[in-house]
A protein has these predicted regions:
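Replace the tail clause
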Residues: 1-383, 387-390, 516-579
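Long, polar/charge-rich, low-hydrophobicity segments
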Residues: 280-283, 409-436, 441-571
Length: 579
């Protein structure tokens, strides 16, 4: 893991999570200090450079705890357990996620970032660690276990979903958060599919305003394509500069669908710029790496921002005038005296943007997390399939099929599905998210080519192995306790939502009955609610002897092969005339 390697020079004696190291702690009656993060996490870098590089802190941790580093992207089950405890304890979450536990995994205390030195009311990490150890020494036998529960959003009525989303919506700037603005991928997808069923002017406004704010503002990399993780302000001005693969996949799906549903050409342009970013920045031997760091040489955003003088001197007078007419260029800057590029309009400036990108590429670049994650790559395949259909670019669908074949070759052994691949080594832990995302992708490519049927059926059965009665579990890893799968659809679809979509699609495509599902609370379970639409008859299921061109179909459509051409929708099937 690139993340674990980032901490290899710390004086803290970090261990990797394993059954053996947990048993060692049990045998030695020593508590655990578990720190969870990921390779492109800014505050993880800060803590690595501060507290975890401090000799006094390291000596105390090494003497009194077994210290374990966890890459959350490699062990989502451990991350989810620790995060549930942190949020139950404090009401907040985040990374680095630092948890003190007994050797038998009873949590003692949890926190995110803490400085190396105390400052006013903010305690140093070392002082916190000392208090935790003192508490443990006095109360070890009385510390209660933390029992994880299946936390699912409440059932909601169909009529309340859009109404509730309207109440969360920011009418001034778009999006749904009152402060920091995260791209609301699943919410946008739900609303866009809703527009396929009902042309609601308020929903049109929400989608347009949010999609335009995301593509014109600071979330978008206007030179390279692709989007950053989130914006730190309500106005979508300054991003947290990391680029995550999952954001590119979800944004590609959103913008291609928005083009198909709303018809605005700028959404097609945005989708195609994300494809370019994937090819130029994330592609690796037929698959895609996980992320690009927010920092360049320990400075956040250094690769992406410009000085006013730099822009003015590099561009010719006419170019600079044209550039300032389309970009919001202030001599005082908008980010620590420098300029992060934000568009004012959609005037084409390809010549200038390519020139600036050429210069930018000569700078030092952010570190890359070169880990290949099965489920996130499956999300890319899903997005490529949908973009191919929505943009009428069938080569993207073929590219998606190649991604799926590569994932099967790399991760599927005929019985179980591996999780990640890095530097020649494959991690064979099995997670619902990977299986569910892959099943959903296969079910989409099956619509083009029925020869995928056997594999689709096999992976569908594998997904069902993650059921525990009526509940889904994220993993059955032998070195950790069972954790129920997440329902929360941000920033990406949850494991539960992907599993339900995959199994619903397979049922509809193979002529099996589906049971009525209830909608869940909006904003928490928006991707799940797309599956409810599908399950409850709000997606067309077209059956025909030969494939119907996707350009002729509504986006809320599945299609499969049959002897007669039928369209099943809202509980009624009608025979269509053969063309």
């Amino acid at each position: 893991s690139p993340y674990l390697l980032q901490h290899s020079s710390n004086p803290v004696w970090w261990q990797e999570w394993s059954a053996e190291i947990i048993q060692y702690a049990v045998d030695g009656k020593k508590p655990l200090f578990v720190s969870v993060g990921y390779a492109t996490c800014h505050w993880c870098h800060v803590m690595a450079a501060e507290a975890f590089s401090d000799i006094d802190t390291a000596n105390f941790l090494n003497s009194h705890f077994i210290c374990i580093k966890v890459d959350r992207e490699q062990r989502p089950d451990i991350d989810q357990f620790m995060m549930q405890y942190l949020t139950a304890l404090s009401g907040n979450g985040g990374w680095p996620l630092n948890v003190f536990l007994t050797a038998d995994l009873r949590p003692i205390y949890a926190l995110t970032y803490a400085p190396v030195r105390s400052s006013g009311p903010q305690q140093s990490f070392l002082s916190i660690a000392k208090k935790v150890h003192e508490y443990y020494e006095k109360n070890a036998d009385d510390i209660e276990p933390f029992i994880t529960k299946e936390v699912h959003p409440p059932i909601a009525g169909e009529e309340s979903l859009v109404k509730n989303l309207l109440s969360y919506y920011d009418p001034d700037y778009g999006g749904f958060d009152p402060g920091q603005k995260f791209p609301p991928h699943s919410t946008l997808l739900y609303l866009l599919y809703f527009l396929c069923v009902e042309n609601n002017p308020d929903v049109q406004t929400i989608c347009r305003k949010t999609l335009d704010a995301m593509r014109l503002g600071g979330l978008n990399d206007h030179l390279q394509g692709g989007i950053f993780r989130y914006c730190v302000d309500r106005q979508w001005t300054i991003p947290h500069f990391e680029k995550m693969l999952y954001d590119q996949a979800m944004a590609l799906w959103c913008y291609s669908l928005a083009y198909k549903v709303i018809g605005k050409s700028e959404y097609k342009k945005m989708a195609e710029s994300i494809v370019r970013c994937l090819d130029d920045c994330f592609a690796d031997n037929g698959l895609f790496i996980s992320a690009h760091d927010a920092d360049t040489e320990h400075v956040e955003g250094a690769t992406y921002v410009w000085s006013y003088t730099e822009l003015k001197d590099f561009l010719g007078p006419d170019e600079f005038k044209r550039f300032c007419a389309s970009y919001d260029i202030d001599e005082q800057g908008n980010f620590e005296g420098l300029i992060h590029l934000i568009r004012k309009n959609d005037v084409s400036l390809y010549d200038i943007e390519d020139k600036l990108l050429f210069l930018r590429n000569k700078r030092a670049q952010p570190a890359r997390d070169n880990k290949i994650i099965c489920g996130i790559n499956a999300l890319v395949a899903i997005a490529m399939i949908q973009a191919g259909r929505n943009l009428e670019r069938p080569e993207l669908e073929e590219k998606a099929a190649q991604i799926i074949r590569r994932l099967i070759d790399l991760f599927w052994d005929g019985k179980t599905l591996g999780h990640s691949y890095y530097n020649g080594a494959k991690q064979n832990k099995n997670f619902l998210f990977d299986a569910a995302a892959l099943l959903t992708a296969i079910s989409m490519i099956y619509e083009n080519d029925a020869s995928w049927n056997t594999l689709m059926t096999t992976i569908a059965a594998y997904v069902e192995s993650f059921r525990d009665g009526e509940k889904w579990v994220e993993s059955r890893a032998a070195d950790f306790q069972q954790v129920f799968a997440s329902w929360f659809d941000h920033p990406i679809p949850s494991s539960v939502s992907l599993a339900e979509m995959g199994r619903t699609r397979v049922a509809l495509l193979t002529g099996k009955e589906t049971k009525f599902k209830s909608y869940r609370a909006s904003y928490q379970a928006d991707f799940f609610n797309i599956t409810v639409m599908m399950n409850n008859g709000l997606f067309h299921v077209i059956s025909s002897k030969s494939a119907v061109a996707w350009s002729e179909l509504s986006p809320n459509t599945l299609q499969t092969r049959g002897e007669t051409q039928t369209d099943c929708y809202r509980g009624t099937c009608r025979v269509l005339k053969e063309k």
